[in-house]
Amino acid sequence: RPMEKLTLKGKARFYEFANETPELLFTSYVGYDASLSTRGRASLPYEYIKRSGGVEAGYEIIPQARASVGYLREGISRNHREVEASNEDIYSGTLDLRPAHWVNVRSSYVHSERKTDTAKYHPHFFEESFPEGEAVTNVAMSLDELRRFDVYNRRRDKVELTSQLSPIDKVDVGMNVSFYEDDYSADYGLQKLWNLGWGIDVMYTPIPRLTLFGDVGQENGRGEMESRYRPVYSNVGYDSLNNDWSGALREKFENYGFGFSADVWPQKLTWGGNYGFSYSQGELLSTFAPGGNSNGDAASFPNVYYKLHRVGSQLSYRFTGQTAVKFEYWYEKYIQTDWAIDPVQPFTN
């Protein structure tokens, strides 16, 4: 703390995920839920090391306002991935406001850039899972960019606004809204991704021994992707620009929940319950048909839907200040409508 209103922070973190799962060799397997392949296939135990370090500087403008800026660098080393090493630079800015004793508002902006270490880029790592080699001999068939969107070069911008309100002693209200944009520098696979989300949570304590709470939120995503249809003739992949196609992704996620917590026996027995419902919808709108426009308009994939109901109850009893037991029960009901999975039947040779 070099000055009364200025604070400096530094942080560093090391995390290693060591995957000790043995490598397995499958002499035959069912491909695409349709046919039996006798070409050997090996599993690739994925593991990584993540290192990060950064600094943050904060300054109190006035007692009701504080601003801060930060920088974080994150490096990841991976095993069994096309991108064995990548680094990401993350820049952030935050403004905290407290216009009244019952209002807290935070606005933030984050810009990050992830870059691949080109010296440690192996686009054909996937061949390691085929000890005998892949059946298709044309290297262009792999379109490895489709397999690395989560680790390849990416630029991200994110803005977020959160607030915490306590208009009266018995009520707390939290609100947030966020938007981010991802831009991937690849010719195929995921190109761009946009996401807009918001959420509200409310907590109400009508009496000291009872608390009621609820929340609602929604996220809407939109993306662009490029791919290529790659037919196989005589065990050789056919690669042509005329077979490129593009698609637009649309995703919507909704979440609702409510519950309660009650002190049945003050400082001894507590009982709570809650219910949550989640709903999501996914669309893939094709905008270009393989083979060129002469083949006609592209056909979009059917929508995909997911629903999750979750009901829970918790009961805890405290014997002493340091000893307690807790019992929980959860019931979940999951429903999905997925055109790619619904008609699949068990394979028989």
What are these regions (language model features)?
Residues 1-349:
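Gram-negative and organellar
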